[in-house]
């Protein structure tokens, strides 16, 4: 398990992370969600032991990560802009990574290099951003670390390659109980691979939980009434969002759906329809409730 306790990080006078607390269970795929500039990349670097927190700590299996070579051998971070030597080829980087990760599997490397159609003898500096991303994904899959951290994992991948990568990750989690943490601005990409998530906003984790459980606890409901309704009529509900237009009401509500429906039925609606929500909507509604200006109507 990865545990984060009271973590704070500043750059000069700017606070990037403040009192972050989080538990990530082994064998899970955790989606780190947040707006641009929220500190996701910094948090991943601290998780990987590349950067030291000013306060607090990160522990993996009850051992501190920073300045701990034993723990770091089990961690691989693929950043949004991965490091490579100026004239290095993919083959060169494979051998470089093998020094730090001697269990790098050549069979897996060749399998995914062929799938991604990458020439291992060409210099990475001449690759497109997408091809560079694919190259380091191939290395990550070949290394199969116990803890894999991915910053903007799907950036530069076409839909087929994204699906291939997701399937490979899922297979490795089943076989090796690998723990994967993915940050992405594309929440729809995370929804079908992540089982847990955390929302990083205003320098800290505001909400965290299981994806399915959270989605099951948030409901989008459309109603129509004979008479006009006011916002006060729905104040007994745990509302994330509400739009009242005369006799038509759109709600986003947290809680047990049967209890919510029973309450709304006492208001004798002409029509009531419960709609599914996706992870992107969960993020938007939670952020709005926290007072973050996601969009204006």
PLM feature spans:
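Catalytic Walker B motif of ABC-type/P-loop ATPase nucleotide-binding domains
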Residues: 148-152
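Conserved structural motif at the start of ABC-family nucleotide-binding domains
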Residues: 2, 17-19, 72
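C-terminal coupling/interaction segments
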Residues: 252-297
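Conserved ABC transporter NBD signature motif
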Residues: 56-71
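ABC transporter nucleotide-binding domain
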Residues: 166-255
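Helix-to-loop junction immediately C-terminal to a conserved catalytic motif
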Residues: 48
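The feature captures the beta-strand-to-loop junction immediately N-terminal to the Walker
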Residues: 30-35
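ABC-family P-loop ATPase nucleotide-binding domains
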Residues: 79-135
């Amino acid at each position: 398990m990865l545990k984060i306790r009271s973590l704070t990080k500043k750059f000069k006078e700017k606070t990037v992370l403040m009192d972050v607390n989080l538990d990530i269970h082994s064998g899970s795929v955790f989606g780190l969600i947040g707006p641009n500039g929220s500190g996701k990349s910094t948090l991943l670097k601290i998780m990987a032991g590349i950067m030291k927190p000013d306060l607090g700590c990160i522990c993996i299996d009850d051992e501190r990560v920073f300045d701990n070579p034993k723990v770091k051998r089990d961690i691989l971070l693929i950043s949004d802009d991965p490091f490579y030597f100026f004239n290095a080829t993919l083959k060169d980087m494979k051998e470089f990574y093998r020094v730090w990760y001697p269990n790098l599997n050549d069979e897996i490397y060749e399998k995914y290099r062929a799938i991604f159609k990458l020439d291992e003898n060409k210099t990475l500096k001449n690759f497109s951003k997408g091809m560079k991303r694919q190259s380091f994904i191939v290395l990550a899959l070949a290394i199969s670390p116990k803890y894999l951290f991915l910053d903007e994992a799907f950036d530069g991948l076409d839909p087929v390659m994204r699906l291939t990568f997701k399937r490979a990750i899922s297979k490795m989690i089943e076989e090796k109980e690998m723990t994967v943490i993915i940050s992405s601005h594309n929440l729809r990409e995370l929804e079908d691979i992540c089982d847990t998530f955390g929302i990083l906003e205003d320098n800290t984790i505001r909400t965290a939980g299981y994806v399915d459980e959270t989605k099951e606890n948030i409901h989008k409901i459309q109603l129509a009434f004979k008479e006009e309704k006011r916002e006060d009529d729905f104040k007994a509900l745990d509302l994330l969002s509400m739009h009242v237009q005369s006799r038509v009401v759109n709600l986003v509500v947290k809680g047990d759906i049967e209890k919510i429906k029973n309450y709304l039925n006492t208001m004798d609606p002409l029509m009531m329809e419960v709609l599914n929500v996706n992870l992107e909507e969960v993020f938007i509604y939670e952020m709005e409730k926290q007072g973050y200006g996601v969009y204006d109507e």
